[in-house]
From Swiss-Prot:
Biological classification of the source: Eukaryota, Viridiplantae, Streptophyta, Embryophyta, Tracheophyta
Biased composition annotated in UniProt, kind: Basic and acidic residues: 325-345
UniProt entry keywords in alphabetical sequence: Activator, Developmental protein, DNA-binding, Nucleus, Transcription, Transcription regulation
Provenance organism: Oryza sativa subsp. japonica (Rice)
Protein name (record): Transcription factor PCF2
Disulfide bonds: none
Subunit structure: Forms homodimers and heterodimers with PCF1. Interacts with SPL14/IPA1.
Xref: PANTHER family: TRANSCRIPTION FACTOR PCF2, TRANSCRIPTION FACTOR TCP4-RELATED
Composition bias, Acidic residues: 354-373
Length: 373
């Protein structure tokens, strides 16, 4: 009996599943052939292994892709950048157009100047509404005076005086940084003495000449306003030959520690009126080594003569073919004597030699008609 009851229950479950599949088949076919239309998939609980699966929520698809909607357009006013107070500000387009028109009508150079003019015209209304005026951020108040560096020359009297004060303060600041540059027609501060910026220390060596000198801590002698006197002779301090540095044979000459400027004798023009001054240049002691240097020594005359005597003496013999004379020249004779001998040999061919003529006469035959017979 129990087995039959189980078989009937299984058959009932199979029939229920068949009916569910039959109902879901037409719905799937209609959704597939819709051609991109919105379709809702209705699914029922499908028993799996005697467990119930929750029914999924319907999902809408449009052409197989999810559509992203654009946000609505923003409704904002158009703004234009206008120059003002040294930076850019934003304002509605109608206000910007009006400012541009006022700039052309008033003949201003920039829109910022037009905005400044508008603020000046509306100053009473601004004070009545806020209790304060339109003071720029770059303006400063000194001793109850408002100073605006960028104020135009067409402003009121106090503002123009504030500009002048600002220019003077900037000029003073530049003169403090550069005290040596004095401009013609400037204030007395520009031509102030250097003592206002640098300490002046009088040199004790130059107190006799007035002491108007500035000490220079560079190791050099102080320079006076009159300059060096004329007619000075430089004398370099070099150790003598008998000093220990030279006598030792090391040839180590220490560098001069001072250079003294000594005036010329009293016979020079104007030398008696000028005081004697000494100019000293201090330097670190340095040594110069000449041991490795080679210097030319004195020439020994005796060795030179001995070398001349040891040289071989060449003999030149010149024979005169015409006169038969022989001239002997040693190596010590000069080339001029040799040239003279050659000239004499050549001239011998020009001079008549009676002996040669007589020999020629003897060789000639005597004719029959000659008177000698």
């Amino acid at each position: 009996m129990e087995a039959q009851a189980q078989d009937k229950a299984e058959e009932g479950e199979e029939e229920g599943t068949r009916q569910q599949h039959a109902q879901a088949g037409p719905v799937g076919a209609a959704g597939g052939g819709g051609g991109g239309g919105a379709a809702a998939v209705a699914m029922s609980a499908i028993p799996m292994n005697s467990w119930l699966v929750p029914k999924p929520e319907p999902v809408e698809f449009f052409g197989g892709m999810a559509m992203v909607r654009k946000p609505p357009p923003r409704n904002r006013d158009r703004h234009t950048k206008v120059e003002g107070r040294g930076r850019r500000i934003r304002m509605p387009a109608a206000c910007a157009a009006r400012i541009f028109q006022l700039t052309r009508e008033l003949g201003h150079k920039s829109d910022g100047e037009t905005i400044r003019w508008l603020l000046q015209q509306s100053e009473p209304a601004i004070i009545a509404a806020t209790g304060t005026g339109t003071v720029p951020a770059i303006a400063t108040t000194v001793d109850g005076v408002l100073r605006i560096p960028t104020q135009s020359s067409s402003s009121s009297g106090p503002a123009s005086s504030a500009v002048v004060d600002g220019e003077e303060s900037s000029a003073k600041r530049r003169r403090k940084l550069q005290p040596t540059r004095a401009v013609a027609g400037a204030s007395p501060l520009a031509t102030a003495a250097p003592a206002a910026y640098y300490p002046v220390i009088a040199d004790p060596l130059l107190q006799g000449s007035g002491g108007a000198a500035i000490s220079v801590p560079s190791g050099l002698a102080p320079i006076t306003a009159t300059g060096a006197p004329q007619g000075l002779v430089p004398v370099f301090a070099v150790p003598a030959t008998g000093s220990p540095a030279v006598a030792g044979g090391n040839r180590m000459i220490p560098q001069a520690t001072a250079v003294w400027m000594v005036p010329q004798p009293a016979g020079a023009a104007g030398a008696g009126n000028q005081p004697t001054q000494f100019w000293a240049i201090q330097s670190a002691p340095q040594l110069v080594n000449f041991a490795g240097a080679q210097f030319p020594t004195a020439i020994n005359v005796a060795d030179f003569q001995q070398q001349q005597q040891q040289q071989p003496v060449s003999t030149t013999i010149v024979q005169n073919s015409n006169s038969g004379e022989h001239m002997h020249f040693s190596g010590a004779d000069s080339h001029e004597q040799q040239r003279r001998g050659r000239k004499e040999g050549n001239s011998g061919g020009v001079v008549d030699h009676p002996e040669e003529d007589e020999d020629d006469d003897d060789d000639e035959p005597v004719s029959d008609s000659s008177p000698e017979e």
